[in-house]
Amino acid sequence: MDLSKSRLAEKMLLFLYSLSKSSNTININTYKRYIYLYYLTSSFLTGGSDNIDIVIEKGDIRIIGFDSIISDFNSKEYIDIDGNSVIVNDELEYLVSPLLKNDSGAFSYQYREIQPFVNLLQSYSDQFVFTVFFSEPTFKEASLRGIKQMRSSNSRLKGLLSSFQAKLNNADIDEYDILTYWMDYILKNYYIETGENGAER
């Protein structure tokens, strides 16, 4: 497994661990969109430099390496797959929990970056996350221009959030606040106005 795929696998494992704290059953498409949005915002939120390659297919995305990593997790019995659902098994917690006991370790550091992001997205409904995904400027531009493959480092969302932060010029507002404001803007101007009610904070 190459380095970028290995890092993706670690993040996918930590996302599943974080998500399973509220429910062991996770919609695989929502999970994939969480990963996508995390990579497109991580350089803004945390200064991260990891990349994923993304293929745009029929108005949706395929993350290179995602399917094979999911299959690997399944074969190791960390998860079960039931249609569009990922069911997190106890084996995943048995693997991850001991690794997080070292507070100064790289795995724990990644978890502390991922956990607040998961908490933020989980405060919205899955349907709203779907709307955010289709309203995200990188995906919109790639779709309009007919781009079939891109790297997460080409994120237009990072620039949008950075510009918004610069205009506010307020040291008390952190990066997660900026992301929340953007998501609330989508909630008010796209989600509710198009009749997609039911988003819950």
Where in the sequence are the language-model features?
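Domain-edge interaction signal
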Residues: 1-201
